[in-house]
Amino acid sequence: MGDYINVKEIFGCDVFNDSVMQDRLPKKVYRELKKTIEEGKELSMEIADVVAHEMKEWAIEKGATHYCHWFQPLTGVTAEKHDAFVTAPKEDGKVLLSFSGKELIKGEPDASSFPSGGLRATFEARGYTTWDCTSPAFVRHDAAGGILCIPTAFCSYTGEALDQKTPLLRSMEAINTQALRLLRLFGNTTSKKVTPSVGAEQEYFLVDKQKWLQRKDLIYTGRTLFGAMPPKGQEMDDHYFGTIRQRISAYMKEVNEECWKLGVTAKTQHNEVAPAQHELAPIYAPVNIAADHNQIMMRILKKVASRHGMRCLLHEKPFAGVNGSGKHNNWSLTTDDGINLLEPGKTPHENIQFLLVLTCILKAVDEHADLLRESAADVGNDERLGGNEAPPAVISVFLGEQLQDVLEQLISTGTATHSKTGEILDTGVKTLPDFMKDATDRNRTSPFAFTGNKFEFRMVGSRDSISECNVVLNTIAAEVFREACDRLEAAEDFDTAVHDLIKEYATEHQRIVFNGNGYAPEWEAEAKRRGLPILPSMVDAIPALTTDKAVKLFESFNVFTRAELESRAEIQYEGYAKAINIEAKTMVDIATKQIIPAVIRYTTVLAESINSVKAVSAALDVSVQTSLLEKSSTLLAETKAAMDKLSGLIAEAEAHEEGRDRAVFFRESVVPAMKALRKPVDELEMIVDKDMWPMPSYGDLIFEV
């Protein structure tokens, strides 16, 4: 029974969670800290010193020798600097282990070395990390030993947010304030807090480490830049929910254990649609904790893969021709006393509070569809969105038959009198029980779908932080809640006013609702007719961040300033250009050093074969060798010409000013040139001797794991 895991015993064992604080902190200190966590009360340095001491003692017992402020700058990954607990040696040469409240609360990383979009110059280096006590500290064990990781926010010396966490916490305050106002209108006086609750489904690929090491494109960019499809892809639908291979099962087992120890509620695991693709989904958590947990999960997925002789690929589109990877963001609003504001109940037409919340969200998504689209903008997502594998790049809302029918009743007659219910599903097999179907089907093609008691935003890229999309969701919902509350609080007749408001929102924003097939080519034309924003690429979407509408929205809730929004737009433009530049240079490097030499060797062998056969007898047939030689030589020339053109465009890009101008040039000129280079190379792979091809094929990568 060596493989037995006592989940209850190991869960959260490396987390300084509430139960640990209750056990270790003096009662007064614990109560004060809980007030800070739950009510935002300022934490005194006296209390911080006590918390820091107990946190240090607990961490040392867990094997920690260092601590770090663990934060999420605008690089897309987490950052940390390790400091040991040791102090300067005393006269006898011995050291003490120390960790103060000041060290817990504040750190000073170099702000100029992280992306700031112009907010920090190289000579303006000071930045601050500050403890986020709402997200528990944890001890991470790796080759460096035990590290006490303290979740923190990161800001500049002048106070601008330079991370993902700070605006997320601000947006949580905004939605909490406005949602509580809404609840009070309906007579709820007991709920004290409304928190966005999120579960993020994480998709990923696994490939063999030795094969990964032979692919410079995977090493440098996270995705394959060349590669012909094997005879079989995902068309048999036999990988999705299929039996998990033993090697992958062993990997998943260790991933689960690592997640559980750090308090991450890894719940559901399965094979995804594409070969070598998988998914891991946690249970819901408050959105700031869910965002931290997702970062922890991605690190664990990568770390454990290495131990098992594999590499975990989190890129949105590591392989052309098969599905890419996303991160479905399941978002709901819950109170501290267990009420889900997105729970329709059995009779949604009678649930006025739910209908108001629902129509407010419809209005929010319709008015800020461009911002929601931008929140999922990523250079890798450009390769994924819009294919028959992921939502289209057009924001729409799926409600399903039941809620659509209720809204149509409201719009057409002014009154909703009934709700559709699920019917009994008769399987036709006596030994199988009959059961009630759901009142509506699911729509996997919708980017923003209502799924029972939550909204599922399916656009987010697999390697991206979930913070950005949730900042947008929280803030746009808060804006419409505020507008609704302003009107309803001033109304003389609440019942009439709320009824009229629900009908108004449903009527004016029904264009955002689409329950059809988002993959259908007709949908884009229909979306254009409806006036919905169509933003196919990251570069198209970024301007949504800095419109007057967006600035007014975010500044009104103190989520972002104009300067912060402009800096983030600049960072995204730069990030796009740098990513494409690296990919383009990698393609040229691989073509120059690996592919062209390999094809030259192959054509030489063919030429020698032709000459050798003809030397025996001029009458012998060499048409096969000749045909292959002609085709490979033609494709080789096309490859060289395409490579030269791409090299020239890479050099030309340097002349374009950093920011939007350079990003647009990469999208409009460099990306098409990259595709032009890939085409002849992939054709060559199909005819060149496999033993001579310089890198593992798609078949090797996705079927031999």
Regions found by a protein language model. Give the residues of each.
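Basic/polar N-terminal segments that are highly enriched at the extreme N-terminus
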Residues: 1-7, 704-705
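Active-site core of metal-dependent hydrolases
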Residues: 10-125
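Hydrophobic/aromatic-rich, well-ordered segments within soluble, folded domains that form packed cores
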Residues: 64, 68-70, 293-307, 333, ...
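Short, intrinsically disordered, low-complexity segments enriched in Ser/Thr and Pro
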Residues: 87-122, 237, 360-361, 484-493, ...
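C-terminal amphipathic alpha-helical interaction region
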Residues: 505-705
